[in-house]
């Protein structure tokens, strides 16, 4: 839960003294060095000393002042550069200093070494003094901190006979949410939001006469009053400037807190009644379960393209047939399995109905000819929708095009359904709560193994468990700054979210589009790529460039697709937020910290203007992480794994991740026999760890299905062929790049996955009994 408090500021004085024995980056002359200082919690831009020419031991003796809050993690970056006007400045030394190590009133002199072996050193003095100011209103969950904002309104009006269209101006408030703004005089009001205690200034200049500038310090403006100025020019007044500074809202649009939101908690209360009734019937209990005896059961589905979507339909139908679907409170999906969930939740009562209808619709879409998705009329429709999104303010990226093509692959017509619409399917606890997973990364600078943060999407909220920051799902994609909603954009259709959740497939798609000049060439390239992915390895993010003479379908979208090809560029709702001084020790953050940058707050996600969201398959093909939050208190996970290469591979990766992070999870240790010949269902549990959920793992295997068409019903010789399902990773018709199945193949996969669930009814019931027993044992006596 977020806590609000008034925090007074301190004055941090940094005096850059001198350096000793700096190595020269120039071949002929000594170094021409300067030092930059960056403290993003106190200043929006880097400050810089003067340049000392031709010296390996430069003396600067320059002081810089920063107003800081001791509740924030104030990490200053100091860098020494060797100036080079020809080839660009060369970095010599980079060090970090945590101002939190200073006490109020303390003076300290630091000597920073160039390297453990090098002789070069940088000497800096630091002094921290308390200030007797009014303080600032801070809101924090112990990891992130939101600060007071001030809002500056600027109105420009012409004063002479000049036409406003003749004069273009640029307005800048450094560090503001809006950044530089350009417009003609008299075109309206401009707004700038920035932290209230920053000593910023408004700068206005004519674009055709940059020497003409107006500067207005914001700290000198009275709050709530209009201040009128006249723009100074060399000839005559050109425009009248009206300024009004107001305090920003204190109520945040971003929820800073850990654990389920109020809407999810209310849903769980409703769902418990459904679960209790289903468990009483399934387990043939004598009486009703008490509220604290009702276990939390979850389904976890992995990715795998059309294979995952089809298999999940079959397994859900099996659970429905056994009367066990109503025992489930959560269902999580990744990549291809999210397609199934998005389809099903268009019907608010889907789990209370026979799934035969949705399954038949699935078959129609999976078996249809896909050539039409690149027909000229479709390409034009994609272009129009992408252009409209850009006009509304959404960043453009390749994943948006993939989302529209993927929608055409899965549906005959565009669907207007949105993620927040799925709340209707939860209104009286009639269905499990769906949670969709994505991975936030750093783009091309780091791999997903070096930096990957789990992001979860539900009908109620989108957010990061690591940071304890969430927004209502209908606001995902809108613009935020310092926890405040700056610009609300219309909620995206869910196909654009599916594009994020499954853009592992966009790598192959993008390559094919780049090379193709007509649909037939596109599909030829797609199939050729599919043949090279015999073990379903994660595709590299580097795409081979086609010859310059190659015709490309992608050129049709060149002006609209300006972002990194495979990353979903989304406005960052964490933008501007700072870190609490003790964020690194916070139990929720420490549970999820697993990147190379977690100890560097200035480089974490709140510092980025955009999120870079990818398919979780780029790290681990699982959707389990939302279920492992202790506040969700999940007792039993039904693990539905659709991998063709290794029945336990992804689950073992997940187990290793949990072990490294200290997250309670049972050891995943299948025997050599199980590895070689996996069964339809495996149980993993850890009785010694009460916080670890039990896992009932269903790998995608064909075991007794070869001999039985239904539990206890042996196949006749005529039915033998129907029991042969090709699940080899090299030549399977269910390879993840396959977008069309034959009628026979889709029927086999549906029957197999349905059978594997129904054939393990007793194991499912026993796992549910154990979950109830576990709850009873935890009751206070």
Curated annotation (Swiss-Prot):
Keywords assigned by UniProt, alphabetized: Calcium, Cytoplasm, Endosome, Hydrolase, Lipid degradation, Lipid metabolism, Membrane, Metal-binding, Mitochondrion
Entries under SMART domains matching the protein: C2, PLAc
Record InterPro entries: Acyl_Trfase/lysoPLipase, C2_cPLA2, C2_dom, C2_domain_sf, cPLA2_C2, LysoPLipase_cat_dom
Residue numbers binding Ca(2+) 1: 26, 32, 82, 84
Any one GO molecular function term: phospholipase A1 activity
Residue intervals of the PLA2c domain: 246-781
Cofactor dependency: Ca(2+)
Range of residues in the leader sequence: none
Entry superkingdom: Eukaryota
Expression across tissues: Widely expressed. Expressed at higher level in brain, heart, liver, cerebellum and pancreas.
Single biological process term from Gene Ontology: parturition
Keyword Membrane found: yes
Alphabetical list of Gene3D superfamilies matching this protein: C2 domain, Cytosolic phospholipase A2 catalytic domain
Keyword Mitochondrion among UniProt keywords: yes
CDD domains: C2_cPLA2, cPLA2_Grp-IVB-IVD-IVE-IVF
Notes on the domains: The N-terminal C2 domain associates with lipid membranes upon calcium binding. It modulates enzyme activity by presenting the active site to its substrate in response to elevations of cytosolic Ca(2+).
The protein's name in its UniProt record: Cytosolic phospholipase A2 beta
Provenance organism: Homo sapiens
Organism phylogeny: Eukaryota, Metazoa, Chordata, Craniata, Vertebrata
